């Protein structure tokens, strides 16, 4: 199997690409049964049985690997501290390492932390992997799922195409390799760290907010945007990740896209009326194929090694006039987007798996090169958990 890395190229050399999910699970489990279930979940997802190779011309591919390197570790460490430590340690995707799992075994259950490099998939991919693991743990036989990556359908506007042609023409064509990625991690993380703030909206409060949103003609994501920018001044440009699975498949692979909404909070109106105004803007973007596929098409049309260079510019591990200019244009350096949101909505996986029950999920998105604060949202058992992942300097 050989699958080219195209529209997910921007994730390849990014130094902050780890998606995190924590699952609270009720039900007695042994370490042996858990390791077996993890191995089965890895085995049934094609992408986790690949590794990433970079060819001499700079093109990159997922290729089959007989020895997947994703692993599960039983630990007594605090899982929040584990996440902070592990995001700074590069995943060896060239060896097939996409997922690191850490588990606290507790009386009557477990706390499971899944960390996945974005090259292994998007947020929903990690959610579906957890489903596979829990199904296997509950005694079910898993079905094999082929790798699936984004297939954008929209078109770029003439101005964007002209910008891309200009940068592609000026680019020197330098090819980067995994040792360059090692250097990027060293350069980036030597004086940086991230923090995560967690807020839980209980079932009653979540239901109340959703009902008020319904009355106002807004959805929960629009409400969250209004809530987050309520105390800011001027127009705010908020990034929004979105699922790009046209056929609703449950395969692992990066099938996410993104858009943004610009809005100035109106203090003369209620938060729900502001949410309704934001919703109108969002609907216009979400209904436009060109808008929804814009970032995928833009990054996928640039020369692949130029995309790598932009990420290395952000990390402080490479500098070139062409890549520096593009990095600034895209917000990888200089003025980056202050706020981005990924709402996985109500987790579309079962809650009960044989004798095991999923109690709570916490989702933390990566603070990618083009963002400072990333908000992750997911609802399970009626409770909504909101995380705010911030990049700070040490």
Annotated model-derived regions:
Residues 1-58, 79-99, 233-394:
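Acyl-thioester-dependent acyl-group transfer interface
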Residues 1-9, 19, 120, 124, ...:
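Non-catalytic, low-complexity flexible loops and terminal extensions
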Residues 14-33, 95-113, 185-247, 383-384:
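Gly/Ser/Thr-rich phosphate-binding loops and adjoining beta-strand/alpha-helix segments
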Residues 36-37, 131, 211, 226, ...:
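Generic recognition of well-ordered alpha-helical segments
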Residues 46-84, 102-104, 141-182, 235-263:
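Small-residue-rich loop/turn and linker elements
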Residues 121, 134-138, 214, 228-233, ...:
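Hydrophobic/aromatic-lined pockets within catalytic cores
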């Amino acid at each position: 199997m050989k699958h080219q890395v195209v529209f997910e190229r921007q994730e390849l050399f990014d130094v902050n690409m780890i998606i995190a999910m924590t699952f609270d699970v009720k039900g007695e489990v042994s370490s042996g049964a858990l390791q077996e279930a993890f191995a089965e979940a890895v085995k049934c997802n094609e992408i986790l049985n690949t590794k990433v190779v970079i060819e001499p011309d700079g093109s990159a591919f997922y290729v089959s690997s007989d020895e997947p390197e994703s692993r599960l570790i039983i630990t007594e460490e605090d899982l929040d501290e584990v996440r902070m430590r592990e995001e700074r340690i590069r995943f060896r995707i060239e060896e097939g390492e996409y997922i690191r799992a850490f588990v606290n075994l507790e009386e009557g259950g477990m706390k499971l932390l899944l960390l996945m490099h974005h090259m292994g998939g998007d947020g929903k991919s990690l959610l579906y992997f957890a489903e596979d693991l829990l199904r296997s743990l509950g005694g079910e036989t898993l079905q094999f799922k082929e790798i699936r990556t984004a297939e954008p359908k929209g078109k770029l506007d003439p101005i964007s195409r002209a910008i891309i042609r200009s940068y592609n023409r000026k680019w020197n064509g330098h090819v980067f390799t995994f040792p360059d990625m090692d250097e990027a991690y060293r350069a980036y993380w030597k004086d940086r760290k991230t923090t995560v703030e967690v807020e839980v909206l209980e079932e009653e409060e979540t239901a109340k907010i959703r009902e008020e949103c319904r009355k106002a003609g807004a959805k929960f994501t629009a409400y969250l945007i209004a809530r987050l920018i309520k105390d800011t001044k001027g127009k705010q440009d908020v990034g929004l990740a979105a699922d790009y699975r046209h056929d609703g498949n449950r395969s692992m692979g990066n099938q996410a896209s993104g858009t943004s909404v610009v809005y100035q909070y109106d203090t003369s109106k209620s938060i729900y009326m502001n949410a309704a105004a934001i919703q109108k803007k969002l609907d216009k973007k979400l209904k436009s194929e060109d808008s929804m596929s814009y970032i995928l098409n833009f990054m996928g049309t640039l020369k692949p090694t130029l995309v790598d260079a932009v990420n290395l510019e952000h990390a402080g591990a490479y500098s070139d006039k062409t890549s520096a200019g593009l990095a600034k244009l895209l917000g990888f350096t200089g003025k980056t987007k202050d706020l981005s949101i990924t709402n996985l909505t109500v987790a579309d996986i079962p809650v009960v798996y044989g004798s095991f029950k999923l109690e709570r999920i916490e989702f933390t998105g990566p603070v990618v090169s083009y963002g400072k604060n990333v908000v992750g949202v997911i609802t399970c058992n009626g409770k909504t958990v909101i995380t705010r992942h911030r990049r700070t300097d040490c």
